A protein has these predicted regions:
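Small beta-barrel nucleic-acid-binding modules, primarily SNase/OB-fold domains
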Residues: 1-207
Length: 207
């Protein structure tokens, strides 16, 4: 289990979500500056220090891409999976009838609209956010597609809200467990998913 923590202070454009934008509910673009990133190898005992590890850095995984592009990073919300607006079932292969086509999964629109409407309660088009992820080194934060993995927190009506948790608790995302997650993080997502399932079953008149 990772002991360090990476913290990213940035801004989130509410308009990136459907219907105005194309972001899925579990993938968020965050606006950043050169001083947005800070890291502590032991948050309980050592202060966070600004890190420049991502400036002009290239991430190599399924493809090569810049970690920061046009002052933006892509966050894959840790521990959750939401249905997609533009899902591609397979890699392009010669002879496939639906080669290259993208499909909209059930509730893909609803999940991202609900997230949009919730974030819009801030009354602003662009709102401050904080991304947190537990890693031993800053460069451990990426997935194979070059996205940052972490939790996003925003402030709505004076209250800090973890968007990963909010999506699961309200039934708009499923639990998806990562090797990088601690037992505490896994248990939190699991409890929220059980709460959501119990509430939805009750809403549909099921025991």
């Amino acid at each position: 289990m990772a002991k360090g923590q990476l913290r990213v202070s940035g801004q989130m454009d509410v308009g990136q979500f459907w219907p105005a934008g194309q972001s899925d509910a579990d993938t968020v673009t965050v606006l950043v500056t050169a001083n947005s990133f800070s890291f502590s190898p032991d948050p309980a005992n050592k202060p966070f220090k600004t890190t420049k590890a991502f400036q002009n850095a290239t991430v190599r995984g399924a493809s090569s891409r810049l970690a920061i592009r046009n002052n933006k990073i892509t966050i894959r919300l840790q521990g959750i999976d939401a249905t997609e607006l533009h899902y591609s079932a397979t890699l392009p292969k010669k002879g496939l009838i639906d080669n290259g086509k993208r499909f909209r999964q059930f509730f893909g629109e609803t999940a991202t609209v609900k997230l949009h409407d919730f974030a819009a309660q801030s009354g602003k088009g662009i709102i401050g956010c904080e991304v947190l992820t537990s890693v031993d080194h800053p460069n451990d934060v990426f997935d194979t597609f070059g996205s940052f993995i972490g939790d996003i927190q925003i402030t709505i009506k004076g209250k800090k809200v973890n968007l990963n948790h909010w999506l699961v608790q309200n039934g708009w995302a499923f639990p998806t467990y990562y090797n990088s997650m601690s037992p505490v993080e896994i248990n939190a997502i699991q409890q929220l998913s059980e709460f959501a399932r119990a509430r939805l079953r009750k809403a549909f008149g099921r025991n």
